[in-house]
Amino acid sequence: MTMMIITVFLTVIAAVLAILVKNSQTGSGIFAPPEISGSRDVFPSAKVVNLTGASGPESIAFDPAGEGPYVGVSDGRILKWRGEPLGWSDFAHTSSNRQECARPFAPELEHVCGRPLGLRFDKKTGDLYIADAYFGLLVVGPAGGLAKPLVTEAEGQPFRFTNDLDIDEQEDVIYFTDTSARFQRRQFLAAVLNVDKTGRFIKYDRSSKKATVLLQGLAFANGVALSKDRSFVLVVETTTCKILRLWLSGPNAGTHQVFAELPGFPDNIRRNSNGEFWVALHSKKGLFAKLSLTQTWFRDLVLRLPISPQRLHSLFTGGIPHATAIKLSESGKVLEVLEDKEGKTLRFISEVEEKDGKLWIGSVLVPFLGVYDL
């Protein structure tokens, strides 16, 4: 009888939350995504470059010749854009087991097919370095094909959710994140809701082939970006909505502090040619997300609700698909906020890459890239 009462109670709560989220879809409900002062709602005018038979272009990279972009997609492939009319072509993949990897979006097969997330080219060699959520840090040559694993563990602990990277070519090292020791990529929302703090920030020395943990205890370690002068590296902590700065040289070398606190959940971070940083927010931080992350009783209730992951994601993101990109200075000051407040064109963005007067915009969920003219 007690279990029946609890089930009925949770079902009622889920129904109430669903109604509140539906009301939020008008932009005025209590769970609606918050407004950001000074933001410009310009992304509805962005163009889209559709993917054919693929989805989730999480990360974006251009090769040393300026060709591309290249994107990693949900079925484990890395695609190259060859422009109109050629469109997209297969460039590389992270798993040799491709027999079952034909569906554009199949989270249950990610551990078989691979899920390439962060992408970075070595400007000298043309090699593409890949952070695959399931297969660790990999590399593939300029001709593409099957990527080769470089490292799958650090200090005796295997990677569980390799996420993003950046390359310091002068020091011959790669900085990258392992998001969680408990959750895999297809459980990303559970990692956030459980306030998991087992993420790591790692340095891989290409000469010694050794991986060293630089930071640990991170709450969803995510995007990585090296500063223009290489004096510091930034690492995104998604759950706390913060970006951390780890000093690599100078009097503060080896120490870290908060570089920026953001109004939403940051994913990847990318530096532009001026040394500024573009941060993509998966979503803004509304009331539901705040309560889930700060009130234990509310979080415990949410985790017990009999609702689908899709409905839970809708609750967490405020019921309105939207897109937010923030440009930060080298000191962490907010310079610009660009949005698609109602998700008319872009939504749930994962990365913003600035190149030749355009912003190329990825998403872990949608079947296209966004392109916005600055």
Curated annotation (Swiss-Prot):
Task: Give a yes or no for keyword Glycoprotein in this entry.
Answer: yes
Q: What is its main location?
A: other
Cystine links in this protein are none
Question: Which cellular compartments is it found in?
Answer: Vacuole
Coiled-coil annotation reads none
Q: Tell me where the signal peptide lies.
A: 1-18
Record: glycosylation sites: 50
Could you confirm whether the keyword Kinase appears in this record? Answer: no
**Pfam assignment, any one:** SSL_N
The UniProt entry's GO CC annotations, sorted and at most eight, read: cytosol; endoplasmic reticulum; plant-type cell wall; plasma membrane; plasmodesma; vacuole
The record's InterPro entries line, in alphabetical order, gives: 6-blade_b-propeller_TolB-like, Strictosidine_synth_cons-reg
Q: Which UniProt keywords apply?
A: Glycoprotein, Signal, Vacuole
Name the family the entry cites.
Answer: Belongs to the strictosidine synthase family.
Q: What is this protein called?
A: Protein STRICTOSIDINE SYNTHASE-LIKE 10
Q: Tell me which species this is from.
A: Arabidopsis thaliana (Mouse-ear cress)
The gene coding this protein: SSL10
